[in-house]
Amino acid sequence: MSKLELKIPPLIQILIFGSLMWLIDFITPSIPTSSMIVGLSSTFILILGCLFALKGVLDFRTNKTTVDPTNPNKSSSLVDHGIYNYSRNPMYVGFFLWLIAWGLFLSNGFALLVAFLFPVYMTKFQIVPEERTLEELFGQDYVVYKGKVRRWI
């Protein structure tokens, strides 16, 4: 197990990535864009991200299982329905969409590229360790679920 696995909660990761994006925007040139198109696009993507994340949390709450990303061994049930029919990690998809919306809002291609490092980081240090734990907890049911539903979308 790597020292970073399951250590930094995803919401803190969003703040780190978002801050890095802002810093990059501050030190590199932005792309001239139509503020209306950028505003509408980033707002739509942000709302979509909120819906993904919220539905993921609500499905966990409905099934009375933990949403604590640093302690997946507290999971009490395998949630494989609702939005989890389409993604094994809808909350993280939502968070990724938030970062894309932020990158679009900043109108900076370099900053937007940083958003695409988020799923790489999350897969290595959050999702893969979670999957190991869930496979231990739920066995073949989780293996079958992994075979049917994609990790991201």
Labelled PLM ranges:
Residues 1-81, 93-153:
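Membrane-anchoring alpha-helices and their flanking helix-loop junctions
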Residues 86-93:
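Histidine-centered phosphotransfer motif of kinases
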